[in-house]
Amino acid sequence: MIRRLLPFLILPLFLSCITQERSVRRELIAHAGGVLDGYVYTNSLEALQSAAENGYRFIEVDLIMSADSVLVAAHSWEDFNRMTGNAHRGDSAMMLVQFVEQRIHGRYTPMTAAMVNDFFMSDSSLYLVTDKTSEPVILAEYFPNLKQRMVVEAFTYEHYQQLVDEGYFRVLYSCMAEDFASAITRNLMFDKLFPGKRIEWIALHTSGFSYPMFKLLDRMRRFNIALFTVDNYNELHPWQLERVKMIYTNTLLPVPDTAEIP
């Protein structure tokens, strides 16, 4: 009798394990501030405000230098010029005084790094995710009190090691880094051959799952993955979704009460 009932006793436990596996929490990152009135990549004050109001804990900001070497929020100068009616400038950088006078799509406020810092300092529940710039000296200069709430995408292994040493909340090693393949390969052989900081997190493009190099490395050692950019979960195979812990998105909204830090 007990033997006949055993499958029915085990089945709920088995299904519970499957459910837990499928419901693994994934942090959503508002990509460049997230979508705002249908616009993406604005990196604007209004986009950051909207992302925070929509429940995002992690908000990404692209950071580049102005013509007079001041850090500002923009995906690229070509994009910023196009969004502000200055497409004729191509990819030419603006001076800071010009930058702050612009309006993105005619109505949104561009942000300097100082404004970005003030925004995140005003709400201790928010985490700044950076892109484009990973120079430790520059980040420390503009965000001196945010290290414990910064997720930095590192574009060289040297930057990765230094940022980890300096105590940033999380450092993502970018798949766009020129030394990506060599640094990851070295990481797999640390114990025997190479010293250095072990890479724990990778910022990976959705196409990266198909790279033979990634498939090989992933079999040898599983990295934590922050995936960019996903606006529909159906874009990913179930096995890919299970591998991801953070997702950059323009439109996906956070689910309430699931944004706890791991």
Where does each model-flagged region fall?
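Positively charged n-region of N-terminal signal peptides that target proteins for export
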Residues: 1-4
